[in-house]
Amino acid sequence: AAAEFFDLDEDEKDRISMRHGGRAWRGWFPVGGELTSGVPDGKEGIYFGSELGHDHPRVRAGVPLHGPNLFPERPADLRDVVLEWMDRVTEVGRAVLSGIALSLDLDADWFDRWCADPTVLFRIFHYPPPPPGFAGSWGVAEHTDYGLLTLLVQDDTGGLEVRVDGRWVEVP
C-alpha cells in the first residue's frame, strides 16, 4: 500500500502534506522536505502516530506529536494497514523492552510504568533514485535517532548502515 501511495503524483500526495498536520507532526513530505545535518534528505515520507481525535486531552492541550493522522484517499487500504502495523510493532517494542529489562536483571515489566501510553511515531520512507547528474551523497546524512526505541524494516534494496566502533556496517 505504501509503494502505491509513493507512486501517486505529487499533487495527490500533497493533499495530506505535513503542513496540514500541525503540532501532531502527521502527513507527507516531499524529497528534500527534511534536512539532516543541514543537508536536504534524498527521501520522501509519511508520518503517522497513535490515532487520537481532536477531543483527546493531549490534542486539545496542543501536546506535540499527538493528534489525528492524515490518510490519503488512495490507496484505500493504507489506513487499515498502517493502524494494524502500528499496533503490532508497538507490541514488538514492548517485548523488546521486556527483554532488555530481563537482560539487566530487572523484572520483565520494569519499563511498563514509563511506557504504558507511549508516544508512537511511525514513518514510512521512500528513497527514489537520485536525479540525473547528481554528484552528492543520496539518502540521509549521519544522525542519531531520538526516543527510547527505534525499530526498522528495510526492503531488499538495502542501504541502511549503522556505525559500530567508528566504522560503518551494512544492516542486512
Predicted regions and their residues:
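Peripheral, non-catalytic segments flanking oxidoreductase cores
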Residues: 1-172
